[in-house]
Regions:
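Substrate-binding groove of N-acetylhexosamine-processing glycoside hydrolases
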Residues: 1-173, 272
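Extracytoplasmic
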Residues: 133-297
Length: 297
């Protein structure tokens, strides 16, 4: 029971982006730029928040390790300590390197994370699991020590949402909660023609940018995945988010585990508002909805 929240958080963080995707590289592309470690489109704040989450997780795993009797440590190392701490160090290695490229972290910290992965894997490959684990599968660049380089460009700023909801946070509507699925583990499956209602209070401007984040699955019936957004009774046209083949959007969706659609809608000046999400096809899974002040052009 003590380990359940630890493993759930480990899976949640990896759901947002897998450890092997943290270097922003790809294995099947011909363009050489995808063989080189590069920045993720994350702000310094987002990077530090993720590093802190993994640090807290790793510390908890270490505490449990020291409390275990000797006869249980091998099993714990295999099932918990290695997968959680190796993932934490992959994130530490690559995200710290991203900060270091912009002069916001010490390169030595990235190198220490790499050394930690080597040490953890060496420990794994003893006794029962001798020579089973490889910390550099297929010798891909993402598993190497990160090359030191400096960038003159800055990191992006985190855009602040005014309201954020998980699919399960709706005020009204019927849906099936998908426990553990989604960026916060609260995505919902919405049946065809069913609605979810989200409520918010007075808005400061005459328009709102709505960002809808969905599970990037494939169509269940036919070839479409569609929804509409209605704000105070004014509905959008059907919004499609299915992908075709191995398109660039499909690849990006796989890497970040979300399909995203954005729209700007007019907002009347009133004390409260109702935003209604309607699924138009079977297979629609809503992860999150974010509301932003529209960007100034």
């Amino acid at each position: 029971a003590q380990l359940q929240p630890v493993m759930q958080e480990a899976y949640r963080l990896a759901y947002i982006r897998k450890p092997e995707f943290m270097g922003n590289t790809r294995t099947e592309e011909k363009d050489p730029k995808f063989k080189v470690i590069s920045d993720l489109p994350w702000s310094e704040q987002e990077i530090n928040e993720r590093l802190a989450a993994y640090r807290q997780l790793s510390d908890k795993v270490e505490q449990e390790w020291h409390a275990l009797p000797a006869q249980k440590k091998e099993t714990y190392f295999q099932l918990v300590k290695y997968p959680v701490q190796a993932a934490a160090q992959m994130n530490n290695k690559l995200l710290t390197a991203q900060l270091a490229r912009h002069g916001k972290a010490d390169w030595a910290d990235s190198d220490r994370a790499y050394d930690s992965i080597v040490s953890l894997t060496k420990r794994y490959n003893t006794t029962k699991w001798n020579r089973m684990m490889d910390f550099q599968p297929r010798r891909l660049p993402v598993f190497n020590r990160v090359e030191r380089k400096a960038l003159s460009s800055g990191l992006p700023e985190k855009r602040q949402a005014v309201y954020t909801w998980n699919g399960a946070d709706c005020a009204e509507g019927v849906s099936a909660i998908c426990e553990g699925l989604g960026y916060e583990g609260k995505a919902v499956a919405v049946s065809k023609n069913k609605e979810l209602t989200f409520e918010f209070t007075a808005w400061e401007t005459d328009s709102v940018e709505v960002e809808v984040r969905l599970l990037p699955n494939h169509p269940v019936e036919g070839e479409r995945l569609r929804f509409t957004i209605s704000l105070d009774g004014s509905a959008t046209e059907a919004v499609s988010y299915e992908t075709k083949g191995r398109s660039e959007e499909w690849k990006e969706n796989v890497l970040c585990n979300q399909a995203v659609r954005r729209m700007v809608l007019p907002v009347a000046r009133k004390a409260s508002h109702r935003l209604i999400f309607t699924a138009l096809d079977e297979g629609v899974v809503l992860d999150q909805i974010y509301l932003y002040m529209p960007r100034i052009k």
